[in-house]
UniProtKB/Swiss-Prot annotation:
Keywords carried by this UniProt record: ATP synthesis, ATP-binding, CF(0), Chloroplast, Hydrogen ion transport, Ion transport, Membrane, Nucleotide-binding, Plastid, Thylakoid, Transmembrane, Transmembrane helix, Transport
Membrane topology classification: Single-pass membrane protein
CDD domains referenced in this protein's UniProt entry, alphabetically: ATP-synt_Fo_b
Role summary: F(1)F(0) ATP synthase produces ATP from ADP in the presence of a proton or sodium gradient. F-type ATPases consist of two structural domains, F(1) containing the extramembraneous catalytic core and F(0) containing the membrane proton channel, linked together by a central stalk and a peripheral stalk. During catalysis, ATP synthesis in the catalytic domain of F(1) is coupled via a rotary mechanism of the central stalk subunits to proton translocation.
Other known facts: In plastids the F-type ATPase is also known as CF(1)CF(0).
Membrane-spanning intervals of the chain: 20-42
Single Gene Ontology MF annotation: proton-transporting ATPase activity, rotational mechanism
Protein family per UniProt: Belongs to the ATPase B chain family.
Keyword Ribonucleoprotein: no
Classification lineage: Eukaryota, Rhodophyta, Bangiophyceae, Bangiales, Bangiaceae
Name recorded for this polypeptide: ATP synthase subunit b', chloroplastic
Subunit structure: F-type ATPases have 2 components, F(1) - the catalytic core - and F(0) - the membrane proton channel. F(1) has five subunits: alpha(3), beta(3), gamma(1), delta(1), epsilon(1). F(0) has four main subunits: a(1), b(1), b'(1) and c(10-14). The alpha and beta chains form an alternating ring which encloses part of the gamma chain. F(1) is attached to F(0) by a central stalk formed by the gamma and epsilon chains, while a peripheral stalk is formed by the delta, b and b' chains.
Source species: Pyropia yezoensis
């Protein structure tokens, strides 16, 4: 029998690399492995990574455009809201002013009515006063005549 490890031990001269027929075979195996890994593994992984990168980029672009649109809409709604508030305040102010005008007109009418009633009552009181004075004058005249008659009759 041939002792193979012994034969191999004699052939190996030592050193890091042996430049013999196995070196080109190892290089060919390495290059074949690189081509296979590139074809089977690296290209699909690179493709998936590129697709993912493109998806992220388009999603970010879409999200940023949506954010810009949302900001524009928010600004527009804020502007519309402030305009609506301003219009509401103007309507409230005009309604209050109109209500104050109506109330002041009603107060003026009521004052005029009250003044008319007071003037009418004053006239009626003056008329009644005059009538009472005339009645009193007549009664005074009658009483003075009666007193004269009594005085004259008691003197005679």
């Amino acid at each position: 029998m041939i002792d193979l490890p012994f034969l191999l031990a004699e052939e190996i001269e030592g050193g890091l690399f042996d430049f013999n027929g196995t070196l080109p075979l190892m290089a060919l195996q390495f290059l074949t492995l690189m081509v296979l890994l590139n074809t089977i593994f690296y290209k699909p992984v690179t493709k998936v990574l590129d697709e993912r990168d493109e998806y992220i980029r388009t999603t970010l672009t879409t999200a940023s455009s949506m954010l810009v649109k949302a900001d524009e809409l928010a600004a527009k709604y804020e502007e519309d809201l402030s305009e609506a508030r301003r219009n509401a305040q103007l309507k409230i102010a005009s309604s209050q002013k109109e209500a104050q005008n109506i109330v002041s007109e009603d107060i003026k009418k009521a004052q005029l009515n009250a003044e008319k009633l007071i003037a009418e009552a004053s006239k009626q009181l003056n008329v009644q006063k005059e009538e009472a004075l005339k009645t009193l004058e007549n009664q005074v005249d009658t009483l003075s005549d009666q007193i004269k008659v009594k005085l004259l009759s008691s003197q005679s």
